[in-house]
């Protein structure tokens, strides 16, 4: 399942899957992800300048409810590269 990515409440040309893939909606290509400090990142071309995003946060923002406005996203299995929505809380 795919959902649009919003940055600062603005819709972007990107989508995030419930498994943690990021897609450019204009080209339909999956973005390559980099790993830093154990977390998967990708860079989105948004104005006024590109934004580097942690993939687990994009998944959580799109697929998880956060009624208490919790600041952190936890990987249930401790694997920071497992960004499946079922592994996040």
Region locations from a protein language model:
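Conserved recognition-core residues within compact binding domains
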Residues: 1-73, 77-89
């Amino acid at each position: 399942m795919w959902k649009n990515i919003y940055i600062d409440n603005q819709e972007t040309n990107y989508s995030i899957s419930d498994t943690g893939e990021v897609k450019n909606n204009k080209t339909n290509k999956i973005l390559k992800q980099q790993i830093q400090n154990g977390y998967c990142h990708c860079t989105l071309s948004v104005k006024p300048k590109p934004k580097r995003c942690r993939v687990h946060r994009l998944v959580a923002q799109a697929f998880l409810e956060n009624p208490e406005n919790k600041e952190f996203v936890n990987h249930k299995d401790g694997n920071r590269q497992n960004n499946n929505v079922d592994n996040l809380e």
